[in-house]
Curated annotation (Swiss-Prot):
PANTHER family associated with the record: OROTATE PHOSPHORIBOSYLTRANSFERASE 1-RELATED (PTHR46683:SF1)
Annotated protein name in UniProt: Orotate phosphoribosyltransferase
Organism encoding this protein: Haemophilus influenzae (strain ATCC 51907 / DSM 11121 / KW20 / Rd)
Catalysis performed (reactions): orotidine 5'-phosphate + diphosphate = orotate + 5-phospho-alpha-D-ribose 1-diphosphate
Binding sites annotated in the UniProt record for orotate: 34-35, 128, 156
Primary enzyme class: transferase
Gene: pyrE
InterPro entries recorded: OPRT, Or_phspho_trans_dom, PRibTrfase_dom, PRTase-like
């Protein structure tokens, strides 16, 4: 596992963004872990978070023109990612985000920041049902732009209601890569190697066996 992945897991644990235990998800599933990126909520947290996204971008070598953060959670992520890309790697990319309510005065429209043009890197925290991605694709298509890739913090790698995960459905429907800072396999490897968390292994393995893709 790359060092930035291990560091990100440690960071998420230290902020209680990532927890092990027993949690009931919105789907009703009982999960042995929970991830809530909304708890990255200070200036220092967002600065570090942006650096982890930037590290994943560099590792993937994805080719893109604009960073797009869909409302609402994607807005601070997109901003912190674009700042981190410049500060850490000297890469200066435009950033764009949308408002969910179309504004009919002032600058109008539903996009703020850079025009949505060229190859778009969409950044968000997680993909649960893929709804935000589908809404974003309508915006991207309406602006004659192209989705280069999606980058999220965590890929749970678990099935939705069918045989595919929401992420696999997005990849199939939009012919794009979905990248992540970490995924379930990284989490499994981390707890296998860390005695602080190894007691959660049986539940994690059982969960992956039942719901994993």
């Amino acid at each position: 596992m790359e060092q930035y992945k291990r560091d990100f897991i440690e960071f998420a644990l230290s902020r209680n963004v990532l927890k092990f235990g027993e949690f009931t998800l919105k789907s009703g599933r009982k999960s042995p872990y929970f991830f809530n990126a909304g708890l990255f909520n200070t200036g220092a947290d967002l600065a570090r978070l942006g650096e982890f996204y930037a590290a994943a971008i560099q590792a993937s070598a994805v080719d893109f023109d604009v960073v797009f953060g869909p409302a609402y959670k994607g807005i601070p992520i997109g901003t912190s990612v674009s700042v981190a890309l410049f500060n850490r790697y000297g890469i200066d990319k435009p950033v764009c985000f949308n408002r969910k309510e179309v504004k009919d005065h002032g600058e109008g429209g539903n996009l703020i920041g850079s025009p949505l043009q060229g190859k778009i890197l969409l950044v968000d925290d997680v993909i649960t049902a893929g709804t935000a991605i589908r809404e974003s694709m309508e915006l991207i298509s309406a602006n004659q732009a192209e989705l280069a890739a999606v980058l999220i913090a965590l890929n749970r790698k678990e099935r939705g209601k069918g045989e595919l995960s929401a992420i696999q459905e997005v990849e199939r429907d939009y012919q794009c890569q979905v990248l992540s800072i970490i995924d379930l396999d990284d989490l499994m490897q981390f707890i296998e190697q860390d005695p602080r968390y190894s007691s959660h292994l049986p539940e994690m393995r059982a969960y992956r066996a039942e719901f994993g893709v």
